[in-house]
């Protein structure tokens, strides 16, 4: 076990006494003492701080695999890395590898050349941490995988989500690996429960990127992040999905969707508010949002995610009964 990384991540000094380390790791449920006074590394200890996951029978196929392709298809694989360290001790290496393999956009500012990652760091970090934590460890022969293309990044983990994928942003979290989740949260590798997806969507909206795509495929979960591209190239279904995720984020933040918030989401000028109204009409037709009130013209209407209508109606009924 890479015990040094535990102390580095917890910002504690490494004890000089080996028994202090052993007792601390036993309290963390990373190791367990045998009757003969020797020690076993438990699955949690190996997953978090193992030097090589392939050294264990049960976790040998669980290292994070990162593949870089040239172009937008899988025909030309340019590089592949398999990072075998435990997820806590090896997370920084995983992120460094992803950043190195991610395509860059070149910009000039004040005569200086600057390279910026095509995919924002916060969503990438959160999605990779989620894939490591929420994977199904009973699924044999497959582990978390990160595929990087010129125009997108796909993060896949074995195991279907435990909550409805349409409610990732708003539903109370559920984890099939609670001990690992708690440990990685405490070590600062992932967000507190329930706010990871908020941060992902908030960052995506801030940069006016296409909405991430969430898919459940053959008992695996795949999330796709897209590089920036003009609004005119987004399909109607992509715009509808972006509006739905925007509505979920607004709901979590205690507010509603409006023409103004949609203009901000897509970078639409105020004089083109009719375009935002058309996008909202498409989302209404698709059934992903509903009107929050019946007052005001199209420009001033407020909208909620489709599933929020029932709770709104119940609140209004309760108020009228009172």
What are these regions (language model features)?
Residues 1-142, 148-150, 156-174, 196:
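Active-site helix-to-loop segments that bind/position phosphate- or nucleotide-bearing substrates
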Residues 31, 284-295:
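A short, conserved structural fragment
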Residues 73-78, 235-256, 322:
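Short, cationic low-complexity segments
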Residues 118-119, 269-282:
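Short amphipathic alpha-helical interaction segments
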Residues 153-188, 229-246:
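Glycine-rich/acidic phosphate-handling loop/turn and adjacent ATP-lid/helix
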Residues 181, 187-235:
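Long, low-complexity, charged/polar intrinsically disordered regions in eukaryotic proteins
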Residues 253-266:
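Short acidic, hydrophobic short linear motifs in intrinsically disordered regions
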Residues 294-319:
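Short, cationic-aromatic polyanion-contact patches
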